[in-house]
């Protein structure tokens, strides 16, 4: 229901969970590629075994305390971390940027702000964010909104 007073809180929780999930998968991806560079002769079976081990380790470090479930290999499910390497962490940055922009746009004229932001041109992401929303790329807006949503 678009009129629900809980709508914004639920959207914040969804954004936070989505970010946490992709960050977990990204950590597995980075660790898998580090392992592959250290083990260039690894077989597909060894890669599968290591993926399950690393995914379970990342899960136990960051997700089990929140979810109350240990030893899940769920974060190893993204097979494209092997055939399209080292890009998953870019999703996390994109989600952080999206949330920052959404927060910045609240209470402003959407059309005017979008025109202003788009007219900034081609800049490095950090410089563009400073010009677009007035701050560096940061998870702080999401963390503040999450803290508020959990109250």
For every predicted segment, state its role.
Residues 1-34, 38:
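Acidic/histidine-rich catalytic neighborhood
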């Amino acid at each position: 229901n678009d009129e629900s007073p809980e709508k914004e809180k639920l959207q914040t929780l969804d954004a936070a969970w989505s970010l946490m999930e992709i960050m977990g998968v990204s950590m597995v991806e980075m660790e898998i590629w580090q392992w592959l560079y250290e083990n260039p002769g690894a077989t597909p079976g060894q890669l599968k075994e290591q993926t399950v081990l690393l995914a379970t380790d990342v899960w136990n470090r960051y997700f089990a305390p929140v979810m109350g479930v240990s030893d899940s290999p769920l974060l190893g499910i993204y097979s494209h971390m092997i055939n399209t390497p080292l890009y998953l962490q870019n999703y996390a940055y994109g989600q952080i940027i999206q949330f920052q922009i959404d927060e910045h746009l609240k209470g402003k004229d959407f059309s005017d702000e979008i025109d202003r932001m788009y007219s900034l041109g081609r800049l490095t992401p950090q410089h563009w964010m400073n010009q677009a929303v007035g701050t560096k790329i940061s998870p702080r807006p999401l963390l503040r909104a999450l803290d508020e949503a959990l109250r």
